[in-house]
Every structure is written in C-alpha cells, then in structure tokens.
Amino acid sequence: MKAWICLPLLALVLTGCAGKTAYRDSCATNLDTAWHELDLAKAEGFAGTVSYSKALSLLTGAKTQQQFEAFEGCSEKSEKARFYIRESRAGR
C-alpha cells in the first residue's frame, strides 16, 4: 500500500526537478561569453577598473546561481556583467 503512495509522489518530485529548464541555455551562453569577454578585457589591461570589478562580482554571483539552478537570475547577472565589461573596455 505504501508503494502505491510513494511511487507517484517520487515521480512527481523528480518531474519537478527536471522541469527547471527555463533560462538554462541563455544562462550558460551568457555566462560563457561574459567570462571570455572578461578575459579579453584583462588581457587588454582593463583589469584595474571599477567596471571590471563589478563585472567580476556579477559573474561570480551568476555562476553561483547557475549551480543552484536559479537560471533566470544567472541570465540577468551575466547580461549586466557583459554591460560592465563593455564599460571597462571603454575606459569607464
């Protein structure tokens, strides 16, 4: 009797975990692109700017959110980081 109750409950829980796919691809794509752009900015000598530091902290937060499957927040943070990377490369 317990098996008839536990099995559907377990299936429901596993389905809920697998359903967190919204923003997953954009999070991964934006995060990879932003890290690459950050490396380029560092190579060009912009690592000391305030915008570079803001971008680095945003990317660290985005990576943490990706690990905890908070993909929407990850995507937003990585987009903001890319903005600050562009600002850094512009010297602002």
Language model feature labels by segment:
Residues M1-W4:
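Positively charged n-region of N-terminal signal peptides that target proteins for export
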Residues V13-G16:
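C-terminal motif of bacterial Sec signal peptides marking the signal peptidase cleavage site
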Residues G19-S53:
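Amphipathic, heptad-repeat alpha-helical segments
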Residues L59, Q66, F71, S78-E79, ...:
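Inward-facing hydrophobic residues that define packing positions of alpha-helical scaffold repeats
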